[in-house]
Amino acid sequence: MLQFTPPLQPATLILRYKRFLADIVTPAGEALTIHCANTGAMTGCATPGDTIWYSTSDNPKRKYPQSWELTQTQTGDWICVNTMRANELVNLAIEKNQIAELSGYNFVRKEVKYGEENSRIDLLLQAEDRRDCYIEVKSVTLLQQQCGYFPDAVTLRGQKHLRELQNRVVNGHRAVLFFAVLHTGIKQVAPARHIDRRYAELLVQAQQAGVEVICYGFQLSPDGIELNTRLPLLLDEMLSSENAE
């Protein structure tokens, strides 16, 4: 488990703005402006009135020492809005041998430069007796009609990552797109064709070329975050739609 130390503190969300900032009010009535480590649309994750949980940094150089970590929605779901946690969570689960699909490697390297488009891979797994495994981690928090979608906004960077992963397979390596589902209401995952059609098309192409797509849910609470169960990826309906066109 990734434990929050010191413990997170609750507050009520007033407004998220300028992408990286949010105004909150603590239970004691103190108004704070905190940092939001999420560049996405955060649809359904930032409703005014939601309870949010924040961490506090001891770095004296930070202008906004508090960071928004979790949202507890008014419908009872928990969401990790700090996208920087996704890589940390997947790396921790791999090191603890909790993900069977990614077990058996001796070394884990982070943020390694690679590819034809000047990219950095989130995690690179290596072992003497197997192919290098390139892992791109994506945080999934968009819940619509009982399904989790990625991305929540058009992502040219995400499109590039899919091309790079496909090229890794062509070059004889193993490539994995890992969807870290950080919303407790999400029970299945699909590409957000209605938001970023090109990303969805590239995802289908990448999987057909041999890129593995793995989706896992996580248990979330103010105490910490822990790997839960594997979740299904829905591509059949999209493939049917593509073929019809």
UniProtKB/Swiss-Prot annotation:
Pfam family, one: SfsA_N
Coiled coil region boundaries: none
Matching CDD domains: SfsA-like_bacterial
Recorded superkingdom: Bacteria
Molecular function GO labels: DNA binding
Classification via InterPro entries: SfsA, SfsA_C, SfsA_N
Disulfide bridge partners, by residue number: none
HAMAP family xref list: SfsA
Family: Belongs to the SfsA family.
NCBIfam families found in the cross-reference section: sfsA (TIGR00230)
Protein name: Sugar fermentation stimulation protein homolog
Organism expressing this protein natively: Yersinia pestis
Encoding gene (name): sfsA
